[in-house]
Each structure stands twice: as C-alpha cells, then as structure tokens.
Amino acid sequence: DMSRVELPMMFNLHHPLNLEVIGPEAQRDNMQSAAYRVIWGFLRKCPASKVRFCIFDPKEGGGSVRMLSNFVNKMPDSYKKAVTQMSRTEELLSCLKELEGQTLDFIRDRPDYDDLLDYNAHNPRRTEAITLLMLYDFPLNADARCLELLSSVMQKGNKCGIYVILCRNTAVEVASSYDHVDEKLAELEKNCVQIECKENGFALLPYHLSVRLIEKPDAGQLEKFAVEYHKAVEKLNVQSIHFEEILPPEPFQGSTAKVLKLPMGIGDGDSVVSMVFGEGTSHHGLIGGGTGGGKSTLLHTLIMSSMMN
C-alpha cells in the first residue's frame, strides 16, 4: 500500500523522556496496556538489574502493574527492592523528593559526565540503574506540591537516568487547596510526548499519527524471559575484584600514621569496598560465616592487599 508509510518510533534516552498516555475512563484498560508494553520494552532492552521502577497507583494499589509484580516475584530478593509501589500522596511526595535529590547529587558530584548513560559507558564495572517513574490515573492524589517536584524531575531527571511515564485519566480532576494547579498541570504536559488512547488504537499527538506499540509477551514468553533474567541477575551478584583495581600506583608507600585503605572486594552498586586503617577507625574486626563461606579467602585478600599497600 503506497499510501501508507511506517516509520520506527524510538526514544533517545540521552534526552528527557517524559511520556504521557492520555485517555478517558473508558480507555483505562488500553492505557494500562500501553504502560505494560513500555515496561516490557525497558526490561527487554536494559541490562539485567539495571532498571528500577517507581510505581504510583492510587486507584488499584499496584493492580495496574500486575505483570511487573508477577515478574519480580520470580527474581531474587535483592531485585525486588528495585520496585517501589505507592498509593498515597505523601508516599509520592517522598519519592519525588528523593528523585530530585538524586538528580541534584549527580549534577554536583559527577560534573565530568553528560548523564548517567555517559557515566555507565565510562565505568562498565560501576554501572548504575536507570529509573522509570510511572504514575497511573494521573493526576489522582497528586497535589500542587507533587506537581512542582514532578516538573523538576521531568526537566532534569534524565541527567541521572530518570524517565517519567504518566497515564492521564481525563476523568480525574486535581483536588488541591493550592493555587494555579491547572496551570502547573498544563506546564508539566508541555514537557511530555503525548500518546492518545482510542478504541481503535493509539495516536501520537498533536499530529494524530497512528502508533503501533510493541506486542505484549504471552505467558510462555514472559516465563522464559523471567528464567533467563533470573540467571543473568545471579551471575551479576557473583563478582570478584580485579587485581588491577587494587594495585596502588606506588606499592609499599601506605602508612597507618595517616589513613590506609585496603581494597577488599565489590559491594553494592559494583563499588570497591575497602577496609580502612588509621585515624578515626578501628583496627579490630570480626569475620563470621559458615564452612566454605569465604573466611579464609577474605583473610588472604586482606593480607595480600596489606602487603601491596
């Protein structure tokens, strides 16, 4: 059909990604379906354990993301922490404050990097997860305080890997004692790519171009993917420290008269964990664990690291 042209629709995560899926109450299921596909796209494309979800679902208390809950239930306990579910205004407010602080910390502490993706590219053994903030039945339970913080996160959040998905239920009105809420909402939407839910599919606004989203996985595909994902996460959890990372530039020059840091292994966030000797620290430690738990290996690492430093 020469009268029809299909083009790929892709988002560049180096730029702000704020997606608003709009529809009336009658299209609520379709809006959830669209969000479902976005979640699936992120899980499928992002490295294992490198995407964090913050879900605000005031109407169903997590029921809107049952697919994600079922998926995470198959994951190790450590990965379940990567999904935060909220339903109350104060919970959303607290989450937004945390995300805004996270953004400001990144801008202050890592000025040499364009964004989190740039940081990850230059630090492959220290990669950090991106965050997908999803608000269902928006703007239900989101008062003016939330809208102000949300606007800040949407404008700066991509700097530290935060992306926002809004499921805008047009039947919901903002209930707030604050002034100019409608203006805040309109300003916020200017920073969004908008997709409208219709009975016959999805349309990209303001052009009303038809959009065909990726297909949802069936139960078998999701089960297979969850098993593979689980294996990938477990593999990531078993890491060792490279000798090059603990070798000091000038061996044998350390001194406990000041501060002596002895690299010991890999900790949370793939960061190097060190045992510190010197001013303000304790020179005593207790190593506990069952048979075969690695006590001797840890002592060997401590001895070798001490000798090299």
Regions found by a protein language model. Give the residues of each.
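P-loop NTPase catalytic phosphate-binding loop
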Residues: 1-113, 119-226, 244-309
